[in-house]
Amino acid sequence: MSNKHGHQARKRFGQNFLHDPGVIERIVRAINPKPEDSIVEIGPGLGAITEEILAINPRLQVVELDRDLIPVLRTKFFNYPEFRIHEADALSFDFSQLVSDRPLRIVGNLPYNISTPLIFHLLSQSGVVQDMHFMLQKEVVQRLAAVPGDNNYGRLGIMAQYFCKVQPLFEVGPGAFRPAPKVDSAIVRLVPHKELPYPAKDLKTLQAVVRTAFNARRKTLRKALAAMVTVEQLQSLGINDGLRPENLGLADYVRIADLLADTGKLQADDNEVSDD
């Protein structure tokens, strides 16, 4: 479906353009941009949110992969000389290069087809971030905020909560977009912890433990983590080896990872970012 700018939404970019003024206003109110903020928008699309933020903060920067959209944005916002467009893939973009005198505030209506790996990429750079506000598939927001025992609880939620406070804000129906997606959406706020509540001795070890556990989420911990820890080691930590991975909280996963870090035993490689 094309729009008044003549741009065809592209499936390969997961494009669904926000057009509902009420939803746009509510999102910007949640972000609460200030003139002095260092704000970066991922995937501005046709500039619906961009326009509202620029009116408050003319130094907004955006990261956009679709080269056909870039001239549309340049033309639309030609009267903002400090507005910067980075033609790049957000999945590999180094956001730390945009940091100047203050941490970044990152916002975006994220393409649903890359939202999970993109969030993992951004979590790895959370040290330079003040907060993040994203429009995501409702299910992804539920996974980000899930607690132990929840069916949505898994690797994404554990690692997001390791780095950030997760605050689901409100839901958005398909009618707010063109073309309308087949799923409901939701807005979430991620605020990196000033101090990690459960700092792991080795982050890669923690990531490997969590990924290994949830690759066998229906099995007991004794079976799911059999290649990494013994029943005796789990019991020494006071962890019931008969529980399933979805019953264990972040603090317990950190304790398992720290035990492995202390013993130097790790049989997994964490160079790859993957989903639950």
Curated annotation (Swiss-Prot):
Family of this protein: Belongs to the class I-like SAM-binding methyltransferase superfamily. rRNA adenine N(6)-methyltransferase family. RsmA subfamily.
Species of provenance: Marinobacter nauticus (strain ATCC 700491 / DSM 11845 / VT8) (Marinobacter aquaeolei)
EC number: 2.1.1.182
Catalytic reaction annotation: adenosine(1518)/adenosine(1519) in 16S rRNA + 4 S-adenosyl-L-methionine = N(6)-dimethyladenosine(1518)/N(6)-dimethyladenosine(1519) in 16S rRNA + 4 S-adenosyl-L-homocysteine + 4 H(+)
Protein name from the UniProt record: Ribosomal RNA small subunit methyltransferase A
Cellular localisation: Cytoplasm
Pfam family, one: RrnaAD
Role, per record: Specifically dimethylates two adjacent adenosines (A1518 and A1519) in the loop of a conserved hairpin near the 3'-end of 16S rRNA in the 30S particle. May play a critical role in biogenesis of 30S subunits.
A GO molecular-function annotation: 16S rRNA (adenine(1518)-N(6)/adenine(1519)-N(6))-dimethyltransferase activity
Keywords linked to the UniProt accession: Cytoplasm, Methyltransferase, RNA-binding, rRNA processing, S-adenosyl-L-methionine, Transferase
GO-annotated cellular components: cytosol
NCBIfam families to which the protein is assigned, alphabetical: ksgA
Keyword set includes Transferase: yes
Lineage: Bacteria, Pseudomonadati, Pseudomonadota, Gammaproteobacteria, Pseudomonadales
Record gene name: rsmA
Residues involved in S-adenosyl-L-methionine binding: 16, 18, 43, 64, 89, 109
Top EC class, one word: transferase
